[in-house]
Amino acid sequence: MNDNHNNVNSIHQFKTQGIDGTEINFKNYEGRKILVVNVASECGLTPQYAQLQELYESFQDKLVIVGFPANNFGGQEPGTNGEIQTFCTKNYGVTFPLAAKIDIETHPIYRWLTSKKENGSIDSSVEWNFNKYLLNESGQLVKYLPSSASPIDETIVDWVNS
């Protein structure tokens, strides 16, 4: 992980551990839009996994989705990395990258995403599972959407196509 997150103007400067133990290097996603979403397996919004997968399959050439499992809200992601990965694959056919389980409040990427001082664009707070952060092809944060926003909402689809 990149703990030197001050004055980082692009998510492309970050790396994190994948749910399978491999590294997710955001630099590999240069030239594609990125949707970052905090996810949970026991939330009323968990069916959004299916919509995220649909979005990913429809736009893989220009969009990457990275899910960050976290147990910060209502204890709704109690599983281990292995249990989460199995759940997502078995129930939703998830093929987009999933990070290893994190703590939203302390993870460097989420500190960067939520602080305008650090990302240069938007102040936000992660208030529940399935909050969405949209980043452009240069890795700059351009939009934040709350949990209630469907991954296949026209706001997101139009943004991907723009």
Predicted regions located by residue number:
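N-terminal "domain-start" segment that seeds a small globular fold
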Residues: 1-27, 47
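Amphipathic alpha-helical repeat scaffolds
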Residues: 18, 38-42
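Conserved helix-turn-beta segment immediately C-terminal to the redox Cys motif
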Residues: 31-33, 42, 46-71, 89-92
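Thiol-based oxidoreductase modules, predominantly thioredoxin-like and allied folds used
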Residues: 38, 62-79, 94-106
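Short, internal strand/loop/helix patches
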Residues: 82-129
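Thiol-/selenol-based redox modules, centered on thioredoxin-like
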Residues: 111, 115-162
